[in-house]
Design a protein with these regions (language model features):
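Beta1/beta-strand and adjacent pyrophosphate-binding region of the FAD-binding site
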Residues: 1-14, 33
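Glycine-rich FAD pyrophosphate-binding loop
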Residues: 7, 23-50
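Short hydrophobic core segments
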Residues: 7-9, 35, 134, 153-172, ...
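An anion/pyrophosphate-binding glycine-rich loop and adjacent beta-alpha core
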Residues: 39-41, 55-61, 186-189, 198-329
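Glycine-rich active-site loop/strand segments that organize a redox cofactor
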Residues: 50-100
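A glycine-rich dinucleotide-binding beta-alpha-beta segment and adjacent secondary-structure elements
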Residues: 130, 313-393
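A conserved short coil-to-beta-strand element within the FAD-binding core of flavoproteins
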Residues: 130-143
């Protein structure tokens, strides 16, 4: 049976960073192996940030995280965005923030991030084994026995679980939850986050592919609970876009648990202000002006100088106006309704897209079952956990990768120091 000092299960962001951190401590005084179930390491990492890899965010703080947030405050304090950027700079990767604080590699290529991690790990002796999926893990004397789906058995003194979550199943299948349970850990309710919202509306597919700037307000039982601004993308079944992803964090909680920020609610809707830079009266004045200037123009064309025409036609119909009616026929109350729709179009939310369309997983192994200063398991000595499989998920904008790096570094260092300590006994 092959034996290693440290085996890391999962070759994604947290796992690769853990391997680098571990070998820097060991300095070739121990062996580190990364097992990856996919054919290639870091597949999900390559897809992040539309292939540019949003590494971290200069605005990192506990306020941008959800789940067991109080447990990770010290971790975020120790591993600031500047500290993470410094780690990558030592690997030869230059980073650059954008105007909103999102940090990317200078060359805007996720492949450069993956290469930096792999080269650094290999330089100090990390070995990799791809297409190796661990199906069973057992705690034995002085370590762990790992059994792979192909029958291969391995022994390791320390084990780090960085298997990722259930989101993007093409890149991560979430087997880490099963392995964690085999060693006594629990897993909270899992649900998709940073994903599209589905809505209830007639003739919705006519909007598919349309984009518009908007202010989006999440309404729970009719009361605003969260809002974000940005570009909204209209899909076949609902809405998408970065600002919608922000809403999906809370919508996901609602549909999975019936709560938002742990408070019970019974209904969910989104209200879109499609003209966030204009006041209601300005919108109404514009509509009145258009009806006077172009009395023969079809109602559906009233918005041609103001809004995407497909949205204009949709809202005219929602207001109960025939799209082909001449503008002169539109009554004042109907114009007011149109203006109100433009400034506050309310749509009932029917759900979120599933894990296949989600960027991250909400829920996971509770951090209360770990020592947050080492990421060591309280259930199985010698076991460490990091990354998305834990009950922490962040906002869109580099926050989830930041936690992967920070927890990966902590787990890797801690496992390595434990190895060295055991050698001295």
């Amino acid at each position: 049976m092959e034996t290693k000092d440290i085996i890391i299960i999962g070759g994604g962001a947290a796992g690769l960073m853990a391997s680098c951190a571990a070998v820097h401590v060991l300095k070739k005084r121990g062996s580190v192996l990364v097992l990856e179930g996919n054919a290639k390491l870091g597949r999900k990492l390559l897809a992040t940030g539309n292939g540019r890899c949003n590494l971290t965010n200069l605005n990192v703080s506990p306020a941008h995280y959800h789940g067991d947030v109080t447990v990770i405050q010290d971790l975020l304090h120790e591993y600031t965005p500047e500290a993470i950027c410094a780690v990558f700079r030592e690997m030869g990767l230059v980073t650059k923030p954008d105007s909103e604080g999102r940090v990317y590699p200078q060359n805007q290529q996720a492949a450069a991030v993956l290469s930096a991690l792999r080269w650094d790990a290999e330089k100090y002796g990390v070995s990799f084994s791809e297409e190796h999926t661990v199906s069973k893990i057992e705690k034995v004397k002085n370590g762990f026995t790992l059994i792979c789906t192909d029958g291969t058995q391995l022994f390791t003194k320390q084990c780090i679980l960085t298997c990722g979550g259930a989101a993007s199943p093409r890149h991560s299948c979430g087997e880490g939850y099963t392995l964690a349970k085999q060693l006594g850990h629990t897993v909270t309710k899992l649900y998709p986050s940073l994903t599209q919202l589905t809505v209830r509306a007639k003739q919705w597919k006519t909007l598919s592919g349309t984009r518009a700037p908007a202010n989006a307000v999440l309404l729970a039982d009719g009361k605003p609970v969260y809002e974000e601004s940005g570009e909204v993308q209209f899909t076949d079944t609902g809405i998408s876009g970065i600002c919608v992803f922000g809403l999906s964090i809370y919508a996901g909680e609602f549909f999975a648990l019936g709560t938002i920020r742990n408070k019970k609610y019974t209904s969910l809707a989104v209200q879109l202000d499609l003209l966030p830079d204009m006041a209601y009266q300005d919108v109404l004045d514009y509509l009145l002006e258009m009806t006077k200037l172009y009395p023969a123009r079809a109602a559906g064309d009233l918005f041609s100088g103001l809004l995407n025409m497909r949205l204009g036609y949709m809202l005219v119909g929602v207001a109960g106006i025939a799209q082909s009616d001449p503008a002169v026929k539109i009554k004042a109350p109907q114009l007011k309704k149109l203006a109100s729709l433009l400034k506050g179009w309310r749509l009932d939310i029917t759900g979120t897209k599933d894990f296949s369309a989600a960027q991250v997983t909400a829920g996971g192994v509770p951090l209360t079952e770990l020592d947050p200063h080492t990421m060591a398991s309280k259930k199985a000595p010698g076991l460490y956990l990091a990354g998305e499989m834990l009950n922490i998920h962040g906002d869109c904008g580099g926050y989830n990768l930041h936690f992967a790096w920070a927890s990966g570094i902590t787990a890797g260092k801690s496992a390595a120091y434990r190895c060295l300590k055991e050698e001295k006994r």
